[in-house]
């Protein structure tokens, strides 16, 4: 499971010109699901996301996590994160989970995350989405769970 996280001042996602999810200060998560991912992978990523220290403390050091700053998290599914770009000029998506598996794991991920954190917003799985954000820093990290 792949998670590209960005610290944001605010972020939103639109589908068909309608805002379907938005947050103020917090984290934008672009979530890529691979064939080998399981519910255990999702649980590990949630643990890491909620504990990951990417927000500044009083000394302006990245020592605070999402819960400590009462931040929101906007989850956006993005299968292109699972692309293999090592060869050629066209990405291969052979390691990406098939749609049914990815949908099941995405739904599981969001349900589990919502059970542990109050401020969760989402896009719509497999929709054509427009994501807007004000990146804070910028601070961006790629997380990968087995």
UniProtKB/Swiss-Prot annotation:
Quaternary structure, per UniProt, is: Homodimer.
Summary of the function given for this chain in its UniProt record: An aminoacyl-tRNA editing enzyme that deacylates mischarged D-aminoacyl-tRNAs. Also deacylates mischarged glycyl-tRNA(Ala), protecting cells against glycine mischarging by AlaRS. Acts via tRNA-based rather than protein-based catalysis; rejects L-amino acids rather than detecting D-amino acids in the active site. By recycling D-aminoacyl-tRNA to D-amino acids and free tRNA molecules, this enzyme counteracts the toxicity associated with the formation of D-aminoacyl-tRNA entities in vivo and helps enforce protein L-homochirality.
Q: Which reaction does it catalyse?
A: glycyl-tRNA(Ala) + H2O = tRNA(Ala) + glycine + H(+); a D-aminoacyl-tRNA + H2O = a tRNA + a D-alpha-amino acid + H(+)
Q: Name one GO cellular component term.
A: cytoplasm
Q: What is its EC number?
A: 3.1.1.96
The UniProt GO MF terms for this protein read: D-tyrosyl-tRNA(Tyr) deacylase activity; Gly-tRNA(Ala) deacylase activity; Ser(Gly)-tRNA(Ala) hydrolase activity; tRNA binding
Cite the domain annotation text: A Gly-cisPro motif from one monomer fits into the active site of the other monomer to allow specific chiral rejection of L-amino acids.
Q: Which compartments does it reside in?
A: Cytoplasm
One GO biological process term? D-amino acid catabolic process
The UniProt keywords, alphabetically, are: Cytoplasm, Hydrolase, RNA-binding, tRNA-binding
Keyword Transferase among UniProt keywords: no
What is the name attached to this protein's record?
A: D-aminoacyl-tRNA deacylase
Family membership noted in the UniProt record: Belongs to the DTD family.
Q: Which Pfam families match?
A: Tyr_Deacylase (PF02580)
Q: Which NCBIfam families match?
A: D-aminoacyl-tRNA deacylase
Q: Where is this motif: Gly-cisPro motif, important for rejection of L-amino acids?
A: 137-138
**InterPro entries to which the protein is assigned, alphabetical:** Daa-tRNA_deacyls_DTD (IPR003732), DTD-like_sf (IPR023509)
